[in-house]
Amino acid sequence: MKSIFYYVSILSLLIVININGQGFLKADGRKIVNENGTPVLLRGMGLGGWMVPEGYMLQTSSFANSATEFRKKIASVIGEEETDKFFKLYRQNMVTKKDIQQLAEMGFNSIRLPMHYNLYTPKDKPFEYIDEGFELTDSLLAWCKEYQLYLILDLHAAPGGQSDENISDYIPGEPSLWESETNRLRTIDLWKKLATRYANEEWIGGYDLINETKWNLPNNNKPLRDLYIAITNAIREVDKKHIIFIEGNWWANDFTGLTPPWDNNMVYSFHKYWNNNDLNSISGYLSMSAQHNIPLWLGESGENSNAWFTDAIELVEANNIGWCWWTFKKIGSVNSPWNVRKSEGYDNLLKYWSGTGSKPSVQAAITGLTQQAIYFNNDNCEFNEDMIDAMFRQVQTTELKPFRENKIPGILFGSDYDYGRYNIAYRDNDYQNVNSGTWNNGWVYRNDGIDLEKCSDAISS
């Protein structure tokens, strides 16, 4: 594993210093500030896949895209009891204290936790609660406190699912969040339970009520607004201090009917993927912010090239908008901070599930899954240093930085070109995805436009 170089810009360092021990975050006009009134620009990372596994993160998207589908695939091979053991080990390894420590050292000052409701309240037992989700959240919050990062709670998978996509763990044929009054009441009750538990926690940065609703809602999103207001009212019965983050419909970006604000400590959160990094791409949100004198937060973005990352962060920070990137770990990834390798046994399961391999024995499957869970541990991951350099150092400077130490005489590899911005450190025609497809055809080693492929040739000259 490559050693980690920590990219904390002067501006990042100042912000981290400013937020230390400064109390609750709050909305103040168009800015987020701490209790001293000092502006805080959130620079965050999302813990995607920890509580809500997604197929593309696990290389199962063609046959098990949602968390429920993934669990069913595993249980069909090793049974429910062993499946429970696997997920416990998976969650134990995927997010550790060391992950949070290193994210803080890289320059992040906040974490977004995508929550699955069923880790807090069982699917088949409405309004009853279990310990697992709360205990995981408590542990994460303790680490965030120690390393002074704000933790933003995000309901990523609401009861029934708030969209018809895998990211909400929606199950076709079952009533969605919008088709069940019980599901909506459960959502309200869960948020009140969370707010009661964390009301006095200064390192909770706020509550992101519902992630990426995607539903054809009537009357200018009235059902979404009504539910948001009901959740807000329930939270305010027990917690009057924390920020309420509000996302629009249609992947968080349609705020029709969601203005004006209904709370004096609210932030509008939009998401940004696969579009140009120009003022026009965020102008509608800026206008909404100015009209209603309310802060904005880019609550989710990423899944692109280093050059796109640099440009996106530069754009939003220039407009006093904090951000949170997606996501921190994936199998076979160059565009997350950590790349997770595949175990041989897990790869055999992928082949079986995709119809290209034979079914492994129960014990072989358990062994492969156990090893895969352990591979998610920070100590076993590869750190993608180039991504972090693009997100922090390159936003502040156009200077180059050596990718590695090169000595002459010696062998120099073209793939080890300097860290730096597009058109300065390197050039490639396809270097970002703005609805035009992939930016890298090799998908190894680095997350720039340069197309590298894995090479096993012996080094001779």
Map each language-model feature to its residues.
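Aromatic-rich peripheral "rim/lid" segments of glycoside hydrolase catalytic domains that contact
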Residues: 308-407, 431
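Extracellular glycoside hydrolase catalytic/binding regions
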Residues: 24, 185-330, 335-348
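Extracytoplasmic
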Residues: 389-461
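Active-site mouth of glycoside hydrolases
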Residues: 27-34, 39-42, 47-243, 248-256
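Bacterial Sec-dependent N-terminal signal peptides
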Residues: 1-22
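Short, polar loop/linker segments at the starts of domains and inter-domain junctions
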Residues: 59-69, 282-286, 424-439
